[in-house]
Amino acid sequence: MSDELQSRTCTPCRGDVPPMTKAEAKRQLAQTPAWTLSDDGRCIERSFTFDDFKDAMSFVAKLGELAETEGHHPDICFGWGWARVTWQTKKINGLHDNDFIMAAKTDGLAPT
């Protein structure tokens, strides 16, 4: 469940672990169903909508603070009323448990 993932803390990825297989990533997506797996299975992405630019910017700022705290950082694009977040562990050029932990934590920041 996403609550279990939200309660976890990211562990530093040293880069000496293999990325998740596409099948493993699909299983993890069951815990973060709002996220989409890329065609190559190397990242997950979700788009968010907001009432205006200020709300989108506030979400991005909160996500930035969370990323700094956890030591794991997303790619973020945003504009008036929207944001798109992509998680991938760059050291392994693919997905790691940390990406799903952070996806769940990102969901916790999203407007309801």
Curated annotation (Swiss-Prot):
It is an enzyme of class 4 (lyase). It holds the Pfam family Pterin_4a. InterPro entries: PCD_sf, Pterin-4-alpha-carb_dehyd, Pterin_deHydtase. It catalyses: (4aS,6R)-4a-hydroxy-L-erythro-5,6,7,8-tetrahydrobiopterin = (6R)-L-erythro-6,7-dihydrobiopterin + H2O. Its EC number is 4.2.1.96. Residues 1-30 are annotated as: Disordered. One of its GO terms (biological process) is tetrahydrobiopterin biosynthetic process. GO terms for molecular function: 4-alpha-hydroxytetrahydrobiopterin dehydratase activity. SUPFAM superfamilies: PCD-like. It comes from the Bacteria. Keywords: Lyase. Belongs to the pterin-4-alpha-carbinolamine dehydratase family. This is Putative pterin-4-alpha-carbinolamine dehydratase. The lineage of its organism: Bacteria, Pseudomonadati, Pseudomonadota, Betaproteobacteria, Rhodocyclales.
